């Protein structure tokens, strides 16, 4: 019976950028039922719905370390570079990030280009 109590959602996580919503069961750096796992940031966590293993969990998101906006871990909403940053804050402060982060952000923005030889394209 105790295991049912710890799986109950505490609330609903909602990303302020993409509006992803999901029930979360824990907020912090050390999710329940983990032996030595410590997350690098205060995170909103839910039990992994794809497994019956109670030790498995999914990190939904965290607060942006600059603006405190609640954002999911999706690559279109945030990135983690020693701390969580929402992409609007990354873009506003792009020169404060290393070249590798800037290149990664450019790759995210670039539309995928199809060549005529790829399936699904018309010539």
From Swiss-Prot:
It comes from the Eukaryota. InterPro entries: CDPF1, CDPF1_dom. Residues 114-123 have a biased composition (Polar residues). Residues 102-123 are annotated as: Disordered. Belongs to the CDPF1 family. This is Cysteine-rich DPF motif domain-containing protein 1. It comes from Homo sapiens. The lineage of its organism: Eukaryota, Metazoa, Chordata, Craniata, Vertebrata. The gene is CDPF1.
